[in-house]
């Protein structure tokens, strides 16, 4: 799924003259870094407003916009060819949060906590791969 989404957002970036990096990078112009952050922040605020108003249409719109902007940010950082592998590694890491009996550990607010078998995702190794 992510590949199709990234391809479509890449077409948008090309059509509108927006940043597209072909190699993984954090070296972006300051204005692009700020823009990507502000776009994500804006959509998070729109999501918050939508859930406060119990407005499913606006929730769906905010989530769709978040995904679109996230794909654009992935493209800006040149991570489009790595993101599926990064996600898979994060998934493996998240599943290692179970306790020794294979049960989840929750914080009072519902956040899943790290269990004794937790391991940090090795994203650096993925970024080093050609």
Question: What are these model-predicted stretches?
Answer:
Residues 1-130:
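Flexible "arm" and connector segments at domain edges
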């Amino acid at each position: 799924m992510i590949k199709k989404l990234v391809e479509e957002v890449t077409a948008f970036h090309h059509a509108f003259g927006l940043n597209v990096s072909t190699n993984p990078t954090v070296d972006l112009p300051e204005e692009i870094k700020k823009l990507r952050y502000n776009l994500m922040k804006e959509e998070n605020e729109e999501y918050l407003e939508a859930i406060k108003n119990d407005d499913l249409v606006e929730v769906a719109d905010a989530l769709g916009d978040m995904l679109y902007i996230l794909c654009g940010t992935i493209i800006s950082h040149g991570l489009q060819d790595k993101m599926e592998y990064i996600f898979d590694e994060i998934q493996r890491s998240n599943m290692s949060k179970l306790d020794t009996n294979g049960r989840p550990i929750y914080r009072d607010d519902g956040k899943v906590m790290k269990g004794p078998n937790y391991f940090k995702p090795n994203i650096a190794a993925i970024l080093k791969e050609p």
